[in-house]
Amino acid sequence: MLYPIKFNPLLKSLVWGGEKIAPYKGIKTEQHHVGESWEISGVPGNESVVAEGSLAGKTVVELLEEYKEQIVGRHVYANTGNQFPLLIKFIDAASDLSIQVHPDDALAGVRHNGSKGKTEMWYVIEADKDAYLLSGLSKTITPEEYEKMVADNTITDVIARHNVKKGDVFFLPAGRIHAICGGCFIAEIQQTSDITYRIYDYGRMGLDGKPRELHTELAKDAIDFKAYSDYRTDYVTRENENTPLVECQYFTTSLLDLTQPLTQGLADRDSFTIVICTEGEGTVTVEGDNIDPQHKTVSLRQGETVLVPACATSMTVTPSGNIKVLTSYIK
């Protein structure tokens, strides 16, 4: 039988990484410059491992092989099979990430042996004073202008800069130039893909002391060169209710800001639900015929992520005081 599942985080030391992730999550590590914590991952070679309960030690791929649609839902399993379709991260940028872009499904499939593209979203958990993000172009340019600006190191002149604060949300469809910049601590929800085309990296060295590879030409085919006016996602928090944030074909994400229990019906969802705690603590309780009644409730605290199986018919998040969580599933 299944239950709400926690996984061991995969910590990634990166040249731009900071020291906030371990204390935020309440864990100890010998690693430094931890830029990312992969909370749930089906990326080959980086598959998440169940942390506790009767399934402890199994990878997310092994769960899918054994439980199939009970884990992810019928329509999800039909589309993605034994690859878990979303990658969930916490990101701590002590300095600026490279300016980059990700391909869409069509381009990634042709170029990268059938891989998926990468559409993603950011939720700002914390931001230093004057922190900002880069997302999208501030004016429409041509591919030829792009190449010249990259060669001249002036590409940053046409990338839209957004001052950010706690709670800000950005949706980044594949093809949108972007960068997380220093002083930002973020929850990221994305398609399962680790394909990144690095456009500009400030001339810095990697952790190995060598310049990091750029992918200027590969990126040119992936970039959406149009400028838009809606890079930041506006929303109004509904306390003790479901606050929709982002809905796209790859994920539907909402915010729950709770001071009292909230129960949501899941029977018609036909999808797993991911619960990411960004602040506070509490519990997640699920019901369903294939849910283990002895282990249907799991604790949840800041920095933890829980996978609610698709076979659950309801989910109740109960705060201890106040809790903020992101929930994400596939429609």
Report the location of each language-model feature:
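Short beta-strand segments in beta-sandwich/barrel cores
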Residues: 263-264, 280-285
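Functionally critical, mid-to-C-terminal surface segments that flank or help form catalytic/ligand
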Residues: 214-267
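Ligand-binding loop in jelly-roll beta-barrel domains
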Residues: 81-83, 91-96, 127-130, 176-196, ...
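Intrinsically disordered, low-complexity linker/loop segments enriched in Gly/Pro
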Residues: 115, 126-166, 171
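An exposed, glycine/acidic-rich loop-and-rim segment of catalytic or binding clefts
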Residues: 152-158, 169-171, 177-228
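Transition-metal
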Residues: 1-141, 201-232, 253
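Short acidic-glycine-tyrosine-enriched beta hairpin
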Residues: 158-171, 185, 287-312
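His/acidic/aromatic-lined binding-pocket segments of jelly-roll/cupin-type domains
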Residues: 88, 97, 114, 120-123, ...
